[in-house]
């Protein structure tokens, strides 16, 4: 056992790194304790960088494509709307808004069960099943002929897609350390933005097939996107490894490096058996609900913006085909800014302040959408401002929670709980954009939602800072804590919350 100094501690005086990962900062200590750097652990910095490069080379494009296809299948209903779907299916009143919202009913209900099952079922099987099932559902959506059929298809699609994001996020936490997560989960949310850009470009091309084979262009949109997803689902079974230490894309040397990393993170990863204690701990943790409520506001904007952006731009007076390509640069900006923000948060080990800064842009954007109803140029510019923070806020907040929850089953439950509460915002988002062309109710609701989320991020920063201070005092006053051991969970005094 190492005894701890009883002298006053200060963050600037040094830092302790756990064996959980060579780069994970756990708690700041007094200057009587020698900091353990990356070079003192089993892997050198060059070895670590080499390993991460090999992992990212295969995993990054794989998860990006999977989530891009999923978000494309989910949000292409917006492209189909401006391409004539409501008229062809004779939708009346608020039936389209119901179609947009009902997806999230089954999506919410099945997120948590799917995530908790992933480790038992095995990642490659679970992910392949999810992708193939939602792709087939998307294909069948192209053959719907009335409101009832489309309603059923959207309910099934919600069930099939429910586990994809939490399973991918959880899978990444099994491979990457807490401070390495931000840019990796960034790939997922960047994909959601890119799906809008790709969806607009793809829709612009496919809608020219209107009438081919007797099918409307929006039907071809669903059919072709579903076929692409099906191919991806089959491929992922052979690409994603269940055991990363035996991954086919790692050399023998890199496999050995990965084994060392996993041994160093053993306490967090060893949960081979289901742990009800971890599940219960997630449900009783105050900060999980703080993350979930702030994510609810972020996702209200995300789902409203990503689903109805074509309709919002169409309401400015542009033609159906023009709308499809006008959405592309807006989505690309959203993806680019989110990736940049995630790398900044990873570099400086801060999430909250970047979330707050990012949210300023959509707050201004929604104000412009409400205040400048008769100026098309300003309205279109406002869409760019919204895209800057909409994707950044939703993505970084999930990363923030993932980095501050441990061990495995508590993290799995917390991610699922956060997303279940947050994704219920999709039901709200589907209902607020119902009064074209100005969509005042939608923009006002989104403005209020993102403002409240920003306030909650501020509260969360102060809460976590207070908890870190308490942990630091506990370490400074204890003479029995073994610093050579990993934190058992995020409540452990050696576990430092990322702000």
Curated annotation (Swiss-Prot):
Molecular function GO labels: carboxylic acid transmembrane transporter activity; transmembrane transporter activity
Matching SUPFAM superfamilies: MFS general substrate transporter
UniProt subcellular location: Golgi apparatus; Membrane
CC per GO annotation: cell division site; cell tip; Golgi apparatus; membrane; plasma membrane
Name of one Pfam family that matches: MFS_1
Segments crossing the lipid bilayer: 51-71, 98-118, 127-147, 155-175, 187-207, 220-240, 301-321, 325-345, 352-372, 378-398, 412-432, 444-464
Name the UniProt record assigns to this protein: Uncharacterized transporter C1002.16c
């Amino acid at each position: 056992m190492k005894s701890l100094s009883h002298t006053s501690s200060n963050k600037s005086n040094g830092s302790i790194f756990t064996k959980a990962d060579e780069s994970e900062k756990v708690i700041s200590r007094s200057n009587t304790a020698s900091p353990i750097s990356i070079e003192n652990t089993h892997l050198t910095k060059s070895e670590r960088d080499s390993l991460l490069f090999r992992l990212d080379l295969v995993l990054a494009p794989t998860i990006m494509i999977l989530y891009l296809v999923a978000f494309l299948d989910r949000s292409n209903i917006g492209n189909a709307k401006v391409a004539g779907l409501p008229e062809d299916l004779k939708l009346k009143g608020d039936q389209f808004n119901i179609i947009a919202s009902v997806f999230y009913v089954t999506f919410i209900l099945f997120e948590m069960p799917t995530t908790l099952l992933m480790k038992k079922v095995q990642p490659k099987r679970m992910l392949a099943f999810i992708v193939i099932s939602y792709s087939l559902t998307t294909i069948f959506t192209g053959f719907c002929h009335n409101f009832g059929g489309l309603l059923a298809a959207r309910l099934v699609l919600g069930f099939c897609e429910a586990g994809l994001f939490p399973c991918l996020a959880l899978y990444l936490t099994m491979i990457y350390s807490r401070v390495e997560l931000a840019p990796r989960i960034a790939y997922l949310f960047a994909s959601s933005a890119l799906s809008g850009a790709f969806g607009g470009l793809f829709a612009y091309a496919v809608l020219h097939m209107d009438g081919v084979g007797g099918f409307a262009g929006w039907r071809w949109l669903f059919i072709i996107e579903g076929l692409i997803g099906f191919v991806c689902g089959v491929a992922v079974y052979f690409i994603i490894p269940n055991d990363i230490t035996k991954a086919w894309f790692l050399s023998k040397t890199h496999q050995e490096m990965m084994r060392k990393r996993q041994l160093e993170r053993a306490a967090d990863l060893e949960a081979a058996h289901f742990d009800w204690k971890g599940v219960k701990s997630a449900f009783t943790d105050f900060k999980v609900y703080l993350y979930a409520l702030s994510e609810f506001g972020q996702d209200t904007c995300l789902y409203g913006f990503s689903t109805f952006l074509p309709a919002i731009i169409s309401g400015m007076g542009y033609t159906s085909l023009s709308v499809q390509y006008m959405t592309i640069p807006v989505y690309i900006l959203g993806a680019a800014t989110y990736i940049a923000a995630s790398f900044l948060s990873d570099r400086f080990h801060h999430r909250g302040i970047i979330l707050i800064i990012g949210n300023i842009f959509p707050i201004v954007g929604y104000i412009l959408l409400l205040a400048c109803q008769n100026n098309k140029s300003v309205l279109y510019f406002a869409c760019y401002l919204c895209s800057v923070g909409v994707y950044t806020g939703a993505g970084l907040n999930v990363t923030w929670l993932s980095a501050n929850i441990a061990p495995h089953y508590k993290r799995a439950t917390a991610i699922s709980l956060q997303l279940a509460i947050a994704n219920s915002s999709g039901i709200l988002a589907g209902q607020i954009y119902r009064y074209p062309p100005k969509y005042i109710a939608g923009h006002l609701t989104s403005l209020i939602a993102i403002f409240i989320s920003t306030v909650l991020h501020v509260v969360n920063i102060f809460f976590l800072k207070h908890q870190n201070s308490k942990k630091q005092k506990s370490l400074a006053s204890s003479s029995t804590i073994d610093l050579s051991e990993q934190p058992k969970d995020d409540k452990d005094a050696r576990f430092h919350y990322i702000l």
